[in-house]
């Protein structure tokens, strides 16, 4: 079975068994994908407030009770094992990347699942729009911008964006399509000159892989949930767990069920 034809449940099974270890862009098409942040209960409200104040990069899909690892948006799933790769931060610095966080998870851990732009890729592909990173077998390009998010408590971060190149006419269509997906970042936040949002070189993404921008194409930028990882690690907490960029949690929610019209 092709990756795009997998059900969300089947993909999670492959991830849990170690058979799938790569980014999830283009996989299980039609299912909503999510960013993950796990942090201590005492900081959960402030982080929730950060997400509420910054809904474009951090749209909330699910917040679990302390110590719970089975999300309501994917009954039977296990957030400790069902992502291809996790990042472990200690005192605000990246310590390691792992494929299982069961030994680090505790009764004090609160998990947040936030919408991901991979979720509207199926609609873009159906409209004949290019998803260059899928075409080239790469992770999506992600960049830290010069735009600040609204802080909350100890949490602050610059806005992170994903970039997908396309022609100007395709960009107009992409705006029309993605505006509907408000819980997975919605419409682009910027189209065109990357320097206007503080990006110096498209060939050097901060996360993910560079992709080819062809003659006649322009970069189109969407808010990205990796913003949440920068925010969660900004106060240098003893332990924070996030997804590894591009290695998302795939829920049982359907893309088309999450649109505003």
What are these regions (language model features)?
Residues 1-115, 126, 131, 156-230, ...:
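Metallocofactor- and cofactor-centric catalytic cores in central/energy metabolism, strongly enriched
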Residues 116-118, 133-150, 169:
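Active-site glycine-rich loop that binds ribose-phosphate moieties when present
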Residues 120-121, 229:
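Short, well-ordered alpha-helical microsegments
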Residues 150-156:
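Contiguous alpha-helical scaffold segments within structured protein domains
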């Amino acid at each position: 079975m092709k990756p795009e034809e997998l059900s969300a449940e089947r993909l999670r099974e492959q991830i849990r068994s170690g058979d799938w270890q790569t980014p999830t862009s283009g996989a299980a098409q039609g299912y909503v994908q999510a960013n993950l942040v796990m942090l201590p209960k005492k900081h959960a409200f402030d982080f929730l407030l950060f997400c509420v104040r910054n809904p474009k990069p951090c749209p909330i899909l699910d917040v679990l009770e302390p110590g719970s690892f089975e999300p309501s948006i994917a009954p039977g799933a296990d957030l400790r094992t069902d992502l291809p790769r996790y990042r472990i931060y200690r005192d605000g610095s990246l310590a390691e990347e792992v494929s299982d966080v069961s030994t680090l998870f505790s009764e004090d851990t609160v998990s947040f699942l936030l919408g991901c732009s991979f979720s509207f890729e199926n609609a873009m592909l159906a409209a004949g729009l290019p998803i260059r990173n899928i075409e080239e077998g790469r992770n999506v390009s992600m960049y830290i911008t010069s735009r600040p998010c609204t802080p909350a408590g100890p949490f602050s971060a610059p806005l992170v964006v994903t970039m997908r190149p396309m022609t100007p006419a395709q960009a107009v269509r992409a705006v029309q399509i993605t505006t509907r997906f408000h819980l997975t970042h919605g419409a682009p936040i910027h189209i065109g000159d990357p320097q206007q949002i503080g990006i110096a070189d498209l060939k050097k993404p901060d996360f993910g892989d560079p992709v080819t921008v062809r003659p006649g194409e322009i970069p189109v930028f969407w808010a990205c949930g990796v913003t949440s990882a920068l925010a969660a690690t900004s106060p240098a907490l003893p332990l924070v767990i996030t997804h590894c960029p591009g290695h998302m949690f795939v829920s049982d929610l359907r893309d088309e069920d999450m649109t505003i019209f």
